[in-house]
Amino acid sequence: MSKSFVLHSAFRPSGDQPEAIRRLEEGLEDGLAHQTLLGVTGSGKTFTIANVIADLQRPTMVLAPNKTLAAQLYGEMKEFFPENAVEYFVSYYDYYQPEAYVPSSDTFIEKDASVNEHIEQMRLSATKALLERRDVVVVASVSAIYGLGDPDLYLKMMLHLTVGMLIDQRAILRRLAELQYTRNDQAFQRGTFRVRGEVIDVFPAESDDIALRIELFDEEVERLSLFDPLTGHVESTVPRYTIYPKTHYVTPRERIVQAMEEIKLELAERRKVLLANNKLLEEQRLTQRTQFDLEMMNELGYCSGIENYSRFLSGRGPGEPPPTLFDYLPADGLLVIDESHVTVPQIGGMYRGDRARKETLVEYGFRLPSALDNRPMKFEEFEALAPQTIYVSATPGAYELDKSGGEVVDQVVRPTGLLDPIIEVRPVATQVDDLLSEIRLRTAINERVLVTTLTKRMAEDLTEYLEEHGERVRYLHSDIDTVERMEIIRDLRLGEFDVLVGINLLREGLDMPEVSLVAILDADKEGFLRSERSLIQTIGRAARNINGKAILYGDKITPSMAKAIGETERRREKQQRYNEEHGIVPQGLNKKVVDILQLGQGLAKTKAKGRGKAKAVEPAGLSAVEMTPKALQQKIHELEGQMMQHAQNLEFEEAAQIRDQLHQLRELFIAAS
């Protein structure tokens, strides 16, 4: 199944990239556990990492600090490695309210969640790829450190089928039910199977557009074929096939029975403790809830909130780390932590918040103490489990520098020849009027401006002031969710408005080549918003424009300002030297705006499989890119209905066309959520 990594790119490594690639590869081959790549904005860090992956041929996990950046990286990696398995592993919840108890008001909040089926399918596809092949790049968010089904149990539960195998129909159906597939002879969808005489059709949970047909004859597997579930068109026949469980959390029956006995023992011990402390209500509540869960597990093999019993189901001891995506990564895997100065602290913070909530549930009799072991990994456990790691950041944190022994691989020179922004320090007294005149200079030549303030009040007042003076301005604040934020960024790039005002403004992440000026108000007020790292990241937002400039308004130069200015000057000088030596003329980036919400061109190009007559599909992405996630979801439901109608009328050409449109819309929906 495994192929070799093949890197597809119109460019060759240039600037600092060849040296960075060589040093990273040498470090990995010498067995260095930690390396840091200091790559400035626009220097092609992702391309460098893609080259390292292609040269070393090792399965890789890329950790991003949020879904937005993960989607962007996934799109880029998909374009670099179209022939290999590039997978996406982020939280599959569109909405998630964990169960919680508020003692002060005696309020119990039930767990409530809405699962995005398409992302769930992509998660299952990611683990399947890691188990089956080596040419895998998984782009993940911090969701990767949360508990996942045990890989050993997951492997045990698989159903292996080969042509000529002796197995009767009922045994296959029983095994499919154990894998949590449901029988549905009418609506054939992901995670279901249907039976027609001696033919069983299975729609694998990790598949998006291919189903399996099992044809039996006299208790023998006569033929295995892969077909298009919409049109019924057989794509190919295969000698063997492995059906993976519908969820990561499936458990063999004998393990469930054993777990139930262990849960009963813990319940008996916990009841004694609660009764000894005269907590009668809590004891009664815990007994009732646990007995109900045990009954459900006995009858169905699972229950609502079964993850709270994960310690027993995976057979781990008290306090042991939960199985996570890292358990699926091969021992010689590679870990790349993007924007490490943000991602590393996130990994450390997840465990504490989760524990505080669960301790209250345990104390008041809503959960057994073992529920505390259904948790994200602690930071120390992550460190112990992480394979060889490359930290990637324009501003590495103290942790990464310490782990790398102070050795940093520099990638300061940009292949495009673009220089770091020119930095000017100007007095605070006239900052608003000075800013207004600078904005007018930029808007006259169709360039954009970012302004970062220290307080919400200041941001609101400044927005109002600029509006009164006829500027097209928007204000970005913490109440705006990820999707709306991406829409605002897209509108800024498209020129719907010219000035974006915010507080902790867009430091790590999305590229905005149209921004030529970054103005930092009150830059001389020391604090986390004006630290060296924050200043460098904010200044970097103007580094993709040929006329990039950063203005720091302050009456004195603080140590953080001095370091940020010094570091930017160092990078600027190094780039200038390189440009002169190689006769490079800096070129501005011209990045399509549509790219923000799409997950790489590779995803949009769906093939019309085996149907030569299929008409060219209208690119759903172009008009759909304007839509909000809610509108996208509505459009998806609408098209699904039309597709089924065409399929029932045997109009397979039209149904297939709509299916291809749905592919594109779903990718846009993932990026937007």
UniProtKB/Swiss-Prot annotation:
Residues 633-668 form the UVR domain. A motif (Beta-hairpin) lies at residues 92-115. The keyword Cytoplasm applies. Gene3D superfamilies: P-loop containing nucleotide triphosphate hydrolases, UVR domain. ATP binds at G39, V40, T41, G42, S43, G44, K45, T46. GO terms for biological process: nucleotide-excision repair; SOS response. GO terms for cellular component: cytoplasm; excinuclease repair complex. The keyword RNA-binding does not apply. Residues 431-597 form the Helicase C-terminal domain. Residues 26-183 form the Helicase ATP-binding domain. Forms a heterotetramer with UvrA during the search for lesions. Interacts with UvrC in an incision complex. Belongs to the UvrB family. The beta-hairpin motif is involved in DNA binding. HAMAP family: UvrB. This is UvrABC system protein B. It comes from Klebsiella pneumoniae (strain 342).
